Amino acid sequence: MASNALSSFTAANPALSPKPLLPHGSASPSVSLGFSRKVGGGRAVVVAAATVDTNNMPMTGVVFQPFEEVKKADLAIPITSHASLARQRFADASEAVINEQINVEYNVSYVYHSMYAYFDRDNVAMKGLAKFFKESSEEERGHAEKFMEYQNQRGGRVKLHPIVSPISEFEHAEKGDALYAMELALSLEKLTNEKLLNVHKVASENNDPQLADFVESEFLGEQIEAIKKISDYITQLRMIGKGHGVWHFDQMLLN
C-alpha cells in the first residue's frame, strides 16, 4: 500500500523522485521510509521522509579525536605530589620574571609607606600627602598580590625576594620635601612601568599570550595614568614653590 502510494506520488511529481544517497558501488546503509497524509486547502498530500541508519557506515572527515589528542606529552597530567596540575605552556622565564615583578611592587610599596610615615609626623603634618602615599603603598602591595595570585593560577611557584630598606627622611633644602618626594614617586612609577614592559616582553618571547593579556589588561593602562597624575602634581608644586602654597596643595590631596 505504501509502495503504491509512493509510486503514484513520484509519477505525478517526477522532479521529486528520490535520488540515490550513496555513490554507485558504495555499501548501502539501511533506509527507512515514513509516510504521512496531510489535508489542507481542500487537497490531500502524501509526505514521504527517509532516514539513513549510519551506525554501520565508516566515520569520515573527523578533525578532533579527544581521546587521542590528550595522549600528547604536553597534555600529560603530573602524578607527583609536588608538581603543578594547572601548569600549561608556562615557561620558566615567565615564572621568574613574575617573581621579580612581585619584588618590584613590594619594594615600591615599601618606599611609599616610608613617605606616608614621614608626612604623617607631627613636625611635618601634611595629612594630604600622607594620605596620598599611604594609598599608593596599598595600591602597589595590591599589585604584588595580583601577580602572586596569577603565578599560582598558572602553576608557578611564588618566591619572595628581600626588600631593600627605604630612606625615612625626605627633606630637601632646595626643592622642599613635598616636591622632592613627588619627583621620587614619579621616578618609581616610570621604573615600575619599565619592569612591566619587560614582563610583557618575556611573555611575547615565550609565546604566552595569556600572560601578555594579563599585564596589558591589569597594569599597563593604569600605569600611564599614574605617571600622568604625578607629573601634574610635580608641575603644580614647582609653580607654587616651598611657601604657603604647599599647604593648599596638601589640602587639595586631603579633600
UniProtKB/Swiss-Prot annotation:
Residues 88-241 form the Ferritin-like diiron domain. It is found in: Plastid, Chloroplast. Stores iron in a soluble, non-toxic, readily available form. Important for iron homeostasis. Has ferroxidase activity. Iron is taken up in the ferrous form and deposited as ferric hydroxides after oxidation. Residues 49-87 are annotated as: Extension peptide (EP). Keywords: Chloroplast, Iron, Iron storage, Metal-binding, Oxidoreductase, Plastid, Transit peptide. GO terms for molecular function: ferric iron binding; ferroxidase activity; identical protein binding; iron ion binding; protein domain specific binding. It catalyses: 4 Fe(2+) + O2 + 4 H(+) = 4 Fe(3+) + 2 H2O. Fe cation 1 binds at E105, E140, H143. Residues 1-48 form a transit peptide. InterPro entries: Ferritin, Ferritin-like, Ferritin-like_diiron, Ferritin-like_SF, Ferritin_CS, Ferritin_DPS_dom. The keyword Transmembrane does not apply. Pfam families: Ferritin. It is an enzyme of class 1 (oxidoreductase). Belongs to the ferritin family. Fe cation 2 binds at E140, E189, Q223. Its EC number is 1.16.3.1. Transmembrane segments: none annotated. It comes from Arabidopsis thaliana. Induction: Up-regulated by iron overload treatment, and by H(2)O(2). Up-regulated by the phosphate starvation response transcription factor PHR1. The keyword Transmembrane does not apply. Oligomer of 24 subunits. There are two types of subunits: L (light) chain and H (heavy) chain. The major chain can be light or heavy, depending on the species and tissue type. The functional molecule forms a roughly spherical shell with a diameter of 12 nm and contains a central cavity into which the insoluble mineral iron core is deposited. This is Ferritin-1, chloroplastic. GO terms for biological process: flower development; intracellular iron ion homeostasis; iron ion transport; leaf development; photosynthesis; response to bacterium; response to cold; response to hydrogen peroxide.
